[in-house]
């Protein structure tokens, strides 16, 4: 869920991919992440199993950990309970396949047909410093998708809550696509196109991390951008959207908790869509490779593991999670404040990056918030030509957008309460991810900027929480 995490820049013409990069990393320079090949294999196997387990526990075990009943062996439990429920409810029907495939294809169609704006990415040394063009219209795609879903719902063609009602089968479909597309893309890059970079020579690890940097279908449909910005957050939004419709049809009203989830996921989906062109020049788009980690996680992992709050509310009766008016209002206010800092902070660092590059034309897409753009911001000029922002929210905390992002996710779980462990999966997992990324970036920046990084730390001494951490 975290947006791109660096506020440093020289300009948009400074390559992020080193000029000495080769297709294979020298053996003595390989630095494995995520536990290396064994860790990568464990995650490729473990994450799909975890997603299925959490869904089964949420739907069939009252939101508690699915465990053997008294006197039941683990073998019988796995075969008779878990596997049988997966077979009955988790194997996709033709409708599930058609729905998810259609959703992906429609989003791809919107990507290449709806209005938008053009921007350019970072110069890429593996393409002789070429800057790839990006067409950004996710905001149009988002609201067109909402209108289309409402038309289909009220004409009786497809209820808005179809995905929520069939979440097991559709999740399996997404898992299948995530795994199979990762394998297919890796094999094509290795044996057909030769588009692979920074490889270790270990196929398991390399497929997990990815082979290509900027895979595209045709000239403009960038797969990394497509799957990162649209698919996961649109799915989460429509699960929440469906939850509200389902509650209204079932109870005649929509609970504050369901409204909160819809509001929370609208905030994030809209933020990703409206800020799409700000993602283009980031480290993620220019440097991170596109493999299982990004492809699977965006098409399946994010939407169908981060949705546990939605599932908890969907599968429990409203009286289970009724809170006081004051508590509900507090969480609505808290997420709104956190979103303000998240939105304006990301805008500050990205508008700074683009203005330094001489490109100050940025859309003011709804909601455009006060203090989003800095006037004459302060910065440190580094010996390598880069600029480090020391103004705005970042003078208080270098990763303040991480903190604001995390507070948003925390409110999701707080709105569900403590009756089930699964709504807390995302905040716990996300905390680990953000801390890992924060200190990873610290090491990379210290290596990249040297003594200038020490100056930067003097100006911006705190990472996550002002005066604390």
UniProtKB/Swiss-Prot annotation:
Pathway(s) annotated for this protein in UniProt: Steroid metabolism; ergosterol biosynthesis; ergosterol from zymosterol: step 5/5
- Does Oxidoreductase count among this protein's keywords? yes
Biased composition of type Polar residues is found at 1-13
Q: Where is this region: Disordered?
A: 1-20
Q: Which UniProt keywords apply?
A: Endoplasmic reticulum, Lipid biosynthesis, Lipid metabolism, Membrane, NADP, Oxidoreductase, Steroid biosynthesis, Steroid metabolism, Sterol biosynthesis, Sterol metabolism, Transmembrane, Transmembrane helix
Q: Which domain of life is it from?
A: Eukaryota
Q: What positions does the entry give for NADP(+) binding? A: 349, 353, 389, 401-402, 441, 445-449, 456
Q: Which reaction does it catalyse?
A: ergosterol + NADP(+) = ergosta-5,7,22,24(28)-tetraen-3beta-ol + NADPH + H(+)
Q: What topology does it adopt in the membrane?
A: Multi-pass membrane protein
**Entry keyword Cytoplasm:** no
Which residue ranges traverse the bilayer? Answer: 36-56, 97-117, 138-158, 174-194, 225-245, 290-310, 322-342, 415-435
Say where the protein is mainly found. Answer: endoplasmic reticulum
Listed GO cellular component terms?
endoplasmic reticulum membrane
Q: Name one Pfam family in it.
A: ERG4_ERG24
Q: What induces it?
A: Expression is induced by fluconazole and repressed by caspofungin. Expression is also repressed during biofilm formation.
Q: Tell me its EC number(s), please.
A: 1.3.1.71
Could you cite one Gene Ontology molecular function of this protein? Delta24(24-1) sterol reductase activity
Q: Which GO biological-process labels does this protein carry?
A: ergosterol biosynthetic process
InterPro entries xref list: ERG24_DHCR-like, Sterol_reductase_CS
Q: Where in the cell is it found?
A: Endoplasmic reticulum membrane
Question: What does the protein in this record do?
Answer: Catalyzes the last step of ergosterol biosynthesis by converting ergosta-5,7,22,24(28)-tetraen-3beta-ol into ergosterol. The third module or late pathway involves the ergosterol synthesis itself through consecutive reactions that mainly occur in the endoplasmic reticulum (ER) membrane. Firstly, the squalene synthase ERG9 catalyzes the condensation of 2 farnesyl pyrophosphate moieties to form squalene, which is the precursor of all steroids.
Which family would the database say this protein is a member of?
A: Belongs to the ERG4/ERG24 family.
Any idea what this protein is called? Answer: Delta(24(24(1)))-sterol reductase
Q: Which organism is it from?
A: Candida albicans (strain SC5314 / ATCC MYA-2876) (Yeast)
What phylogenetic lineage does the species belong to?
Eukaryota, Fungi, Dikarya, Ascomycota, Saccharomycotina
